[in-house]
C-alpha cells in the first residue's frame, strides 16, 4: 500500500552543516580530463572495490546487484543499468528518481517533482514500496513508512530489471533499485560545494575521507549537506540536511569491516500534485491550473521526517576458496504530515467565478523500526572443466510500523484566486495500526563458466510472517506464508564482446492486508522470460544492452465489486517489451548515454471484466532519452564542458477504463561547466524550454505536472 493509495482511500472515505546541499563533483574519478575536478588517486575500500566503487565515466564494468557477488555486468542474466557518480554530477540530479530519468525500462518521476519521495516504475510496475535497496539490503516501505536517500551520499544507483526474489526474497516483480553508498577511501579526499537554483533553494555540501593511520588499516568517509529555500510552488519552505559517516577497518588483505551510518532531517511544505484532469491535462473554463499553484494551508502545512541508519559490512577470506560475509543494518524513521489535499472540484465540475476545488484534511504520524541481516558464504572452485562461484546465504528482514492516519473535512480553495488562512475542520482517525512483518530466507546461487558459456542457477525459499493490530475498528489479521523463487540463466561470451543470454525466473512479493472477510492476502507472484544481448566492444569503451521480456504479475489487488473500500485478489497484469540502452566513453572528453523502451502492458484478469485487455493507468508504453557530454581537452578552452539531453515520455491513461488520455511530452535538458585547477563551476537547466505537461494521473482527480524549468548553479573546490 503506497502513500498515494493511502491518501486516495482517506479522501474517498470523506468525500464519498552549516551548509546547504545538493550533488557534488565526483570525488574518485579516474578521468580528470572529462571536466570533473582532477582529484588525487582514490582507493575505494569495500566489497570488491570495483563493484561498489566509482564508475569510469559513464560505462560500468562490474556490479553486485543481481548476483550479490562481484560480477561483470555481462555475466548477469538480466538487464542491469548502473548510474555512476560522474553521470549524476554531469546532470546535477538532486533526487534518486531524477537520476533515473535517462534509464531504459524505468519511468521515473511519474508524479512530478515530489519533494519528499522518490517514485519510479520498472517494466510497468511501481517499485517504490518493495523495490528499493541500499547496499543490497532492503529499504521496505508500507504506507508512509518509507525512507528517503539523498543522491549526494551515493556512489552508484543500480537497476536490476525483472524479478529479483531468487536473491533478495519478497520484492517488486518489475525490478529493484539498489543504492550504493560512498565508501571510505585511503587517500586524502577533501571537497566542498555550494550552489543555488532558480526556485531560490540554496545548498552546500562536503565530502571528506582518507586514512586514519600510516598503515591505512583505518580509513573514513564523511559526507554531508544541508539545503533550504523555495520550491516550484508559489508558497514553499524546504529545509533538509544529511550527514553520513563511514569507517573501514582492514587489518589484513583478507579481512575488512566497514561501518556505514547516516542521519537525515527534513522539514518542508507540500508541493504540487493531486490536481484534477480537467484543468491540467485538458483546459477548464478558466484555462489550466498553474504549475505554481499551492493547494495546502501555510499556517498548518507540515511535513517532518527524522531518519537514522547504522549498519556494517563484514568480509573475511577464510582461504583461497571460501569467503564469509555478513551485512547488517538497523534503520529508524519518524515522520509527521499535516495539511489538506484537493480532490476534484466542489460539486464535481469547475463552476465560476472561483472554480473551487474540494479539499480533504489529512494527517498522519508514522514510526518505523526495521533491521536486515544477510549472511553469505562464497566459494570459488573448479569441477573438471567447470569453474564455479557458489553463493550460500541466510537472510532475515524485520519491519515494524506504528502509524496513525486521520482524515476530515477541509475548506474548498480556488485555483485561480486562492485565499489562505481559513480554519480547517477536524480530522478523525480511520487507522491506528501496529504492523510487523518478518521474512527469513535461505538462498543458493551457482555461477558456472565453461569456456565461453555462463550459466547462473538460483534457488530460494522464504518464510514470511505478518501481524496487524488496529485500534480503531479495522480488521486485525495475521498470516504466515512460504514461497519458493528461482532463476535459471544461460549466456555465451564471444571474443568480440557480445554476450547473448536467456533467462527464466519466478518471483513473489508479500501483500499486506486482508479482504472484507478478514482473509489475509496471498503474496503476489510473477514469472518472467527474458532474452537479450550485452555488447562490450573491443574498439571503444562502451556497453550496449538489448533485451526482450515477457513478465506476468499475478494475485494483483483489485477493487472488490461487492464491498466498497475493500479489495480482492483477482487481478493479473502482463508486461511485454523491448529495452535498448547504450553507455559510452567515446573519447577522453566525449561521453554519451541513450535509452529506448517499448512496452505492451495489459490487464489480463480483473474483478471488473470490462477492464480486461486495457492498459493500466499511469504507465506510458514508449520511453526514450539521450544525453551527450563533451569537455574540451586542451587549448585555451581546456576544462570547458557542455552537456545536452532529451527525454520523451509517451502517452498514458488516467484510468484503467482507458477513457482519459494523458498526452506524450518531450523535454530538453542542458548543462555547461568549467574546471580550472582545483575549482569548478557548473550551470544545469532542466526542462530547458519550460514545457508544461502532465507527467501522469492516478485518477481523474489526481494528476501531476512534470517539473518546470529550473536552473541550478554550483561551485566546487577541492584541496
What are these regions (language model features)?
Residues 152-155, 166-245, 251-255, 308, ...:
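Outer-membrane beta-barrel translocator/receptor signature
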Residues 592, 647-655, 661, 673-719:
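C-terminal beta-signal and adjacent terminal beta-strands/loops
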Amino acid at each position: 500500500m503506497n502513500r498515494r493509495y493511502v491518501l486516495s482511500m482517506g479522501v474517498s472515505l470523506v468525500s464519498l552543516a552549516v551548509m546547504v546541499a545538493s550533488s557534488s563533483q565526483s570525488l574518485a574519478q579516474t578521468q580528470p580530463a572529462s571536466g570533473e575536478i582532477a582529484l588525487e588517486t582514490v582507493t575505494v575500500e569495500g566489497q570488491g572495490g570495483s563493484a561498489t566503487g566509482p564508475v569510469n565515466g559513464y560505462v560500468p564494468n562490474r556490479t553486485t546487484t543481481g548476483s550479490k557477488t562481484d560480477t561483470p555486468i555481462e555475466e548477469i542474466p538480466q538487464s542491469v543499468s548502473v548510474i555512476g557518480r560522474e553521470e549524476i554530477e554531469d546532470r546535477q540530479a538532486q533526487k534518486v528518481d531524477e537520476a533515473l530519468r535517462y534509464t531504459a525500462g524505468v519511468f521515473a518521476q511519474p508524479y512530478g517533482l515530489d519533494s519528499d519521495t522518490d517514485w519510479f516504475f520498472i517494466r510497468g510496475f511501481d517499485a517504490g514500496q518493495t523495490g528499493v535497496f541500499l547496499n543490497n539490503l532492503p529499504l521496505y516501505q508500507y504506507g508512509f513508512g518509507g525512507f528517503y536517500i539523498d543522491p549526494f551520499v551515493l556512489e552508484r544507483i543500480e537497476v536490476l530489471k525483472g524479478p529479483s526474489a531468487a536473491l533478495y526474497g519478497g520484492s517488486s516483480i518489475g525490478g529493484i533499485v539498489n543504492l550504493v553508498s560512498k565508501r571510505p577511501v585511503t587517500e586524502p579526499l577533501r571537497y566542498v560545494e555550494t550552489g543555488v537554483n532558480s526556485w531560490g533553494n540554496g545548498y552546500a555540501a562536503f565530502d571528506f575521507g582518507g586514512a586514519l593511520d600510516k598503515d591505512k588499516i583505518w580509513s573514513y568517509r564523511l559526507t554531508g549537506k544541508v539545503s533550504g529555500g523555495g520550491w516550484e510552488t508559489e508558497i514553499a519552505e524546504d529545509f533538509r540536511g544529511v550527514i553520513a559517516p563511514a569507517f573501514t577497518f582492514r587489518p589484513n588483505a583478507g579481512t575488512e569491516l566497514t561501518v556505514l551510518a547516516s542521519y537525515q532531517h527534513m522539514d518542508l511544505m507540500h508541493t504540487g500534485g493531486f490536481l484534477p484532469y480537467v484543468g491540467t491535462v485538458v483546459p477548464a473554463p478558466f484555462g489550466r491550473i498553474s504549475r505554481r499553484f499551492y493547494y495546502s494551508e501555510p499556517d498548518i502545512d507540515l511535513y517532518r521526517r527524522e531518519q537514522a541508519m547504522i549498519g556494517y559490512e563484514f568480509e573475511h577470506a577464510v582461504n583461497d576458496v571460501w569467503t564469509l560475509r555478513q551485512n547488517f543494518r538497523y534503520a529508524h524513521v519518524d515522520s509527521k504530515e499535516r495539511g489538506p489535499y484537493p480532490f476534484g472540484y466542489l460539486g464535481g465540475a469547475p463552476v465560476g467565478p472561483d472554480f473551487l476545488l474540494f479539499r480533504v484534511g489529512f494527517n498522519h504520524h508514522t514510526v518505523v523500526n526495521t533491521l536486515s541481516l544477510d549472511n553469505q558464504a562464497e566459494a570459488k572452485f573448479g569441477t573438471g572443466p567447470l569453474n564455479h562461484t557458489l553463493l550460500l546465504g541466510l537472510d532475515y528482514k524485520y519491519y515494524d510500523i506504528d502509524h496513525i492516519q486521520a482524515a476530515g473535512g477541509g475548506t474548498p480553495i480556488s485555483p485561480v484566486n486562492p485565499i489562505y488562512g481559513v480554519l480547517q475542520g477536524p480530522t478523525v482517525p480511520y487507522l491506528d495500526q501496529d504492523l510487523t512483518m518478518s521474512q527469513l530466507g535461505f538462498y543458493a546461487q551457482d555461477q558456472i563458466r565453461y569456456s565461453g558459456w555462463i550459466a547462473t542457477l538460483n534457488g530460494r525459499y522464504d518464510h514470511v510472517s505478518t501481524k496487524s493490530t488496529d485500534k480503531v475498528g479495522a480488521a486485525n489479521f495475521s498470516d504466515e506464508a512460504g514461497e519458493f523463487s528461482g532463476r535459471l540463466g544461460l549466456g555465451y561470451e564471444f571474443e568480440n564482446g557480445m554476450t547473448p543470454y536467456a533467462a527464466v525466473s519466478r518471483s513473489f512479493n508479500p501483500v499486506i492486508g486482508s479482504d472484507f472477510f478478514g482473509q489475509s492476502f496471498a503474496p503476489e507472484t510473477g514469472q518472467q522470460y527474458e532474452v537479450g544481448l550485452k555488447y562490450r566492444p573491443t574498439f571503444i569503451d562502451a556497453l550496449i544492452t538489448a533485451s526482450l521480456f515477457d513478465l506476468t504479475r499475478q494475485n494483483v489487488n483489485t477493487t472488490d465489486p461487492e464491498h466498497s473500500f475493500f479489495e480482492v485478489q483477482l487481478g493479473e497484469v502482463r508486461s511485454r517489451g523491448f529495452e535498448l540502452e547504450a553507455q559510452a566513453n567515446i573519447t577522453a572528453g566525449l561521453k554519451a548515454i541513450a535509452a529506448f523502451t517499448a512496452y505492451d502492458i495489459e490487464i489480463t484478469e480483473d474483478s471488473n471484466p470490462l477492464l480486461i485487455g486495457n492498459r493500466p493507468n499511469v504507465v506510458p508504453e514508449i520511453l526514450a532519452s539521450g544525453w551527450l557530454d563533451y569537455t574540451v581537452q586542451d587549448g585555451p578552452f581546456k576544462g570547458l564542458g557542455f552537456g545536452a539531453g532529451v527525454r520523451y515520455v509517451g502517452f498514458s491513461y488516467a484510468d484503467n477504463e482507458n477513457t482519459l488520455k494523458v498526452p506524450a511530452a518531450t523535454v530538453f535538458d542542458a548543462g555547461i561547466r568549467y574546471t580550472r585547477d582545483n575549482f569548478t563551476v557548473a550551470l544545469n537547466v532542466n526542462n530547458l524550454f519550460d514545457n508544461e505537461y502532465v507527467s501522469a494521473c492516478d485518477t481523474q482527480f489526481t494528476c501531476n505536472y512534470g517539473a518546470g524549468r529550473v536552473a541550478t548553479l554550483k561551485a566546487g573546490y577541492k584541496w
